[in-house]
Amino acid sequence: MKSQFSWLVLSSTLACFTSCSTVFAATAENIGPSDSFDGSTNTGTYTPKNTTTGIDYTLTGDITLQNLGDSAALTKGCFSDTTESLSFAGKGYSLSFLNIKSSAEGAALSVTTDKNLSLTGFSSLTFLAAPSSVITTPSGKGAVKCGGDLTFDNNGTILFKQDYCEENGGAISTKNLSLKNSTGSISFEGNKSSATGKKGGAICATGTVDITNNTAPTLFSNNIAEAAGGAINSTGNCTITGNTSLVFSENSVTATAGNGGALSGDADVTISGNQSVTFSGNQAVANGGAIYAKKLTLASGGGGGISFSNNIVQGTTAGNGGAISILAAGECSLSAEAGDITFNGNAIVATTPQTTKRNSIDIGSTAKITNLRAISGHSIFFYDPITANTAADSTDTLNLNKADAGNSTDYSGSIVFSGEKLSEDEAKVADNLTSTLKQPVTLTAGNLVLKRGVTLDTKGFTQTAGSSVIMDAGTTLKASTEEVTLTGLSIPVDSLGEGKKVVIAASAASKNVALSGPILLLDNQGNAYENHDLGKTQDFSFVQLSALGTATTTDVPAVPTVATPTHYGYQGTWGMTWVDDTASTPKTKTATLAWTNTGYLPNPERQGPLVPNSLWGSFSDIQAIQGVIERSALTLCSDRGFWAAGVANFLDKDKKGEKRKYRHKSGGYAIGGAAQTCSENLISFAFCQLFGSDKDFLVAKNHTDTYAGAFYIQHITECSGFIGCLLDKLPGSWSHKPLVLEGQLAYSHVSNDLKTKYTAYPEVKGSWGNNAFNMMLGASSHSYPEYLHCFDTYAPYIKLNLTYIRQDSFSEKGTEGRSFDDSNLFNLSLPIGVKFEKFSDCNDFSYDLTLSYVPDLIRNDPKCTTALVISGASWETYANNLARQALQVRAGSHYAFSPMFEVLGQFVFEVRGSSRIYNVDLGGKFQF
């Protein structure tokens, strides 16, 4: 009996569970293109899909619902459930809601109870003007409404644009939002929640917001809320992590007490592990131009870092937090983990009266900063100062660059406060330069950097050994309540001058300032010693310790430590003297730095080798002109006539030791004429113009214009005597053969225009002229051996080639200009070689090949004295000279179209130890 009763109870229970499962199980339904509807073309009536039992929709194709509610606004969402959950499986298809007029909560999708709504696997989801933000009748209530968990998972592109809600959440209103694993772009653009007191221009969540692991860019742009969160408002925790590119741009809140131009969070806001995050141009009226949060954690996760730029708080009275505002009793943590964090151009604007002050973060009453840290190689840049509420007073120490307990991450990067991005007028406002941290500060590791006139005001400051405090002259490190203790002070050399000094101060009664260890002089950019103030021996204001207690130094050497003892620029030695003033209030201890100049060592950008190297460019050009004249004198038909040719010349000189690579190239034309004298001597004359350029593969380029004239003469005599005997040693018969004697004179003038684009200084320009003279004397004789099959003749030859080129002195314009003394190149060479030539049977075509060895017998390599115009510091500049021996190959050809017209051309290749010269010319000759 007992057994039968138990079985009855069990059977009844199973039946009950089965019945309940049947009642509460969601219905599965396939939907597809047939469910699409366009109210502008369809004459029927659209009927929304409204249920109370929950449905799992599966798409079988793309669906578009558009232009709905034009005749009568919809009163329910296109898909809605008032009791249970809804789910949509996209299966790779798209779902679009376009231009929908509706008064329903969730014009597109709605689950009004505390149930859930999920959308997964779509190729694209589009919510455009659903309902429209530009139509106020009927008042819209958002595109998507969910009383429970709203999930977007594994979708492609997602677009919410120009949606409107008179309640919270212009596009989405939900309890909890999860937006994750999207492979396409996610965009929230132009959505509004602008009714009085409403929040979340794009998204409003009464619970949590999670935006994670989306692999394409995510954009929140031009969204507007009235009270809080121009783009996102979250009552619970807001987590944005593991995404690629995130941009919050031009979002805003409009109420007088409006907070969080882009994002407002009442609990924890965490933005971490993203490849790049940008907050730009967002605006609030009261607090937080970009972010307003109770507890904010920012951690860069990729090379793009996190950037806050041009966010503002603007109202009739000054608000708080140009970029970020931390609520009362809140916390803020910033970690540059895998990219920099930068604040630049953020501001507080008051319109009555009109004032603008730069500001990055404002710390609310009793709030605090828990972390400011950067890993090695990365930084947090505050180009806008941090401010703190007058009641933001914390006894908790802010440890700069300290890892969490149990975390071995090396936080040895830089925390930088700088005024370098301020305009000249902005730099005159003290508030734009002063950052306030109302808590004790300890530099645990890495660098604290103060640049360009900033002041860092702390409750007290201490430094751990191994860390570095880097302060420009003109900056101040201040403790308002406790003491300042520094163990490693570094000062950049390029900040010295104009009476500026580093100030380290303790302003509270009986509090002390202590400085120990050597002071390090830095040259971070590598050009600090290019400062022309160092061109003379002088003293600089250096360091001042100021305290109402005592100002002391311990183990500070009289000679600062130079971080770069070997450097370019002005050379010299440093010395330091201290003066105590214990009678003043506050007491001071002041150091003066003495510089003794001993010389100048130019950096590679200043050396200027392109100027003497230009002589080698002129050298190769005049040699090319010489070859063109010589070629034009050799003709198949009449010697008399006029000719013209195009000319191109290239010189490549490799880097050799400290002498950098050099390249010259030029091109132009040559025209001339030839005739025979009464004594049957051949004469030829020519005019040439070349346009060229030189480069030194660093910062300098030179443009050249060359004008040249040349005269060539050839005399033929008989090969006899000593020369005949000498030639008889060679194969072939030489006695009584013609001996060709030739000579050539050439002159060129080269106009040079040099531009030097320094890395760290303004561009300078200079112009000068090169004058080149060339003389050539040569002799050759032809033999006609029968054993040469490819050629008819061969002709040994010898030449004496003299070239002299002078570079004029000149000076560049500008404060960074240089002066160059004149220099010259003299070269005497003895080319020897043999020429092979072949003629056609009709004597209307020929080609030739010349092989030469060219030793330079006498050489004066170019160099010049170079000086800085502003200071007179000088040095010797040497050219990257060509080797003194060369091998040359010359190939040429002539073709006579008729007795009156002939085409001629040649190619020359010359190789030296570390250089190559190529030139080519092609032209024609009209003969008569």
Swiss-Prot record:
The lineage of its organism: Bacteria, Pseudomonadati, Chlamydiota, Chlamydiia, Chlamydiales. Keywords: Cell outer membrane, Cell wall, Membrane, Secreted, Signal, Transmembrane, Transmembrane beta strand. Residues 1-25 form the signal peptide. It comes from Chlamydia pneumoniae. It is found in: Secreted, Cell wall; Cell outer membrane. This is Probable outer membrane protein pmp10. InterPro entries: Autotransporte_beta (IPR005546), Autotransporte_beta_dom_sf (IPR036709), Pectin_lyase_fold/virulence (IPR011050), Polymorphic_membr_middle (IPR011427), POMP_repeat (IPR003368). It is a peripheral membrane protein. Residues 635-928 form the Autotransporter domain. NCBIfam families: POMP_repeat. SUPFAM superfamilies: Autotransporter, Pectin lyase-like. Belongs to the PMP outer membrane protein family. GO terms for cellular component: cell outer membrane; extracellular region. The keyword Secreted applies.
